[in-house]
UniProtKB/Swiss-Prot annotation:
Name assigned to this protein: Putative transposase for insertion sequence IS408
Function, in words: Required for the transposition of the insertion element.
Region called Disordered, residue ranges: 496-518
SUPFAM superfamilies in UniProt: Ribonuclease H-like
Provenance organism: Burkholderia multivorans (strain ATCC 17616 / 249)
Domain Integrase catalytic: 140-335
Amino acid sequence: MPTPRMSMRKLKEVLRLKWACGLTHRQISRAIGISVGAVSKFAAQASQAGLDWAAAEAMSDDELDARLRPAATNAAATTTRRIEPDYTALHRELRRKGVTLQLLWEEYAEANPGQRTYRYTQFCQKYKDWAKSIKRSMRQQHRAGEKLFADFAGPTVPVLASDGGVEFEAHVFVAVLGASNYTFACATRTETMADWIGSLCDALEFIGGVPELLVPDNPKALIARPDRYEPGLGTTTQDFVNHYGTAMLPARPRKPQDKAKVEVGVQIVERWVLARLRHYRFYSLAELNKAIAELIADLNQRPFKRLEGNRREWFERLDQPVLRPLPVRRYEIATFQKCRVNIDYHVDVGGHYYSVPHSLARQEVWARITRHGVEILHGGKRVAAHARSRLKGKHTTIAEHMPAAHRAHMEWTPGRLLNWGASVGPGAEAVVRHLLTNKPHPEMGYRACLGLLSLARKYGKHRLEAACQRALKIGSPTRRSVLSILEAGLDLQPSLPTTPAEWRSPEHENVRGPDYYH
């Protein structure tokens, strides 16, 4: 059975995590849910196509697919012989501190893009056969600025109502940096997706930067497709990760080595913070979080028992210098909605209609909806952005999204129409003024005046002025009357023998007068 083709969205995420976040192929494999071989394959294709992350990010899905197709064809035509590693060099490099077979295999695969290389297990077995006695260690090592581990503590803290009864049990979120053990904690009402993402945002602001990886304890609130080996992030979770330019690697179930750091951190918070608060009464979440923040500050400045310094000093020395900068804006939780663009180049989001470029009419797009804004995405790229409106049945339209003819129509204001009428002649100006002030709705007057413009293009301004003068004299200054006069050629005949007094519209409640438009 053929391997299903990977989506362009997932391929872009591979390239972002590799080039923008600097993750290894195995870390990317776990984060996205594809094999390490597939990661290596697509990274090699992108390199052969001469791409970098800046170029790939700017491309639409179709452009990226077309760019990579030739590279994929060339890669498939390479020799089927596998590249043998240099076993002597492997044996020598393994003596260096921190170097593992995992790292050496990744370097071996990356050094031979587009070539057939050994999978990780084959690589290890062949080296073992050569060296006869090699043992691999699973010892956890955390580089500075690499990982922020996160989980919720087990015990909860009661928050009381004004009558002294328990209003709700607050849950305590804990985050720990891998290298320095610098710790953050805060309380939330629940453990929903909004609580998880909001607490992670608070943690990132607390440390003042962004690590390479976020490692939560595989929470259902963040994971759309639970899987022991290839968990899939939810759409909103992935959007949050993209906003901060990082990656998320949920800990595997029943794999304590994946989350040992945060489990120790949770235990310390329970003993150092929650145990000290057990006799206090809290009547709001803000009051509880203030008390937690004070104790966390003390915890981070508390000296280590077996090492020199404290968490704060280690953070300033190790993690802080290498953290990536925070984005300008804090992440705002977004929901996503698939939409089809209507024939009028607007999409329906919550009963309000937002414009997109008219070329996308009848196509499918995604709406990214936040509390304050609506973004429209097509082919992985943003094509429109609007302030969110709660007005049902109304339209929000950007002029640049409109066809040229529609845009020209919108640019004709009452003042501009009157100026145009005056440029034709006093008769045309009088007819335009009548049309603008005597139609039941302004839009009807605009359309009638635009009809006069089309008559000027067809018959010329001189004939239009003569027709307007005749329409005024017969007491019928309408577009239809002017058209009839022109079609019958009456404007070419001598003017009527008598000149009636200036025509005036009868007084009635629909008459606005020129001041209505100023």
